[in-house]
Amino acid sequence: LMGDLTGSMSAYHAILKRKFTEICTTLFQLIPNLRIGIIFYLDHGSGDPYITKVQPLTVNVEQLQSFILGTPDGFGGDEDEAVEDALHDALKMNWCEINTHSIVLFGDARPHEVSVCPYQHDYFKITESLFKKQVTINTVYCSTGSDYRRQSSLYEVEIGNFSRRVSRLGNPEFFSWIANVTGGIAIGVEQIDDIVDIIKGLAAKDAGKIDELEKEELKITLRPIPALVHIKKQAKLIEERKKLLGFG
């Protein structure tokens, strides 16, 4: 899990504080050999308490919950946020510990261009390196009222196509690009509470457990969850495309 904890995202952090144990319980029951890591990020030089905070991959739910509760929100500086620093941290994660390499990235702002990042982190090259490690990046664009079904179509690119560099994309377009180019799903948030179902759905999707999650959620809600239905539909299309391209 990777997420923006600047001021505009405080409501999402509050939901994670309340609901993360529920998310973990569901996913650990569904997915064998699951490990969860967390990377939170803020911005550079804005008086914030950190740029990124990392919880390495673990099966310890109490440790994960403690990390979420103990990591403070920040303010953020300019409009762009330190997404590139978080991606750089993700590159250093011990991915060999797990079979399915998957990130769920949530936020509402794009990264800095390499010329602006104090550490010269290049999100384009880092994303390509993550893709080569077979890491899928799913994104949740956190702007309430956005149509979750349209997010993937805002920047269409072939899976694995890094031949053309992107730069200075708009915020929603960045979240669309990074998901599409790594074979992930980009989804928007219509209501803040939706993020819980979306995180569970995206994680279950990459582990091949979306059907099982849907059945479990139906027992509770007694009705299909639109975000899960959308994720399942998109996942099928992406898997077909991956096979066509030789990634499946």
Model-derived features: positions:
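Divalent cation-coordinating acidic motifs and surrounding scaffolds
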Residues: 2-248
